[in-house]
């Protein structure tokens, strides 16, 4: 088993819970305020993690200008994506549509991996990309 497998499992569980809680919140809070609460809480959680690293002498947090730039772009995408999910749920979008939506993002990442990060293409990856895109179109019904 690869060294990152359990991190992937934890991330999948947490992001699954993230969408369930977003669905529950969407009918009880506006998308802007809800998105802000989500992202502020996320920032606070990361701050607690950084404090833990500092206090336990495990600090190994380096950065470059490019790293900060791409992190800012990531934050913009996460913030806008959170608002988009709030709006999706507020307008009656089903929670069951989220896996296909995320698969569309996965297809985008796989294409970027092949085109920009020189990850080897395989028939399995190409099929996964195609199925993810098909899944997005099936959501229209």
Where are these regions (language model features)?
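Hydrophobic/small/kink-forming positions within alpha-helical transmembrane segments
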Residues: 12, 16, 20, 47, ...
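Residue-level "edge-of-site" marker
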Residues: 39, 101, 129
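Alpha-helical structural signal
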Residues: 10-11, 85, 105, 113, ...
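Alpha-helix boundary/capping detector
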Residues: 50-52, 102, 114-115
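Hydrophobic transmembrane alpha-helices of multi-pass small-molecule transport proteins
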Residues: 124-140
């Amino acid at each position: 088993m690869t060294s990152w497998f359990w991190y992937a499992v934890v991330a999948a569980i947490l992001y699954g819970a993230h969408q369930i809680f977003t669905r529950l919140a969407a009918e009880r809070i506006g998308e802007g305020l809800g998105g802000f609460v989500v992202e502020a809480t996320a920032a606070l959680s990361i701050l607690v993690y950084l404090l833990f690293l500092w206090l336990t002498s495990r600090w190994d947090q380096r950065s470059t200008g490019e790293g900060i730039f791409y992190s800012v772009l990531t934050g913009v995408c996460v913030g806008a994506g959170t608002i988009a999910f709030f709006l999706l749920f507020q307008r009656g979008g089903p929670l069951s549509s989220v896996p296909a939506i995320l698969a569309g993002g996965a297809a985008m990442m796989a294409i970027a991996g092949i085109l920009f990060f020189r990850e080897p293409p395989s028939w399995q990856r190409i099929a996964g990309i195609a199925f993810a895109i098909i899944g997005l179109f099936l959501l229209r019904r």
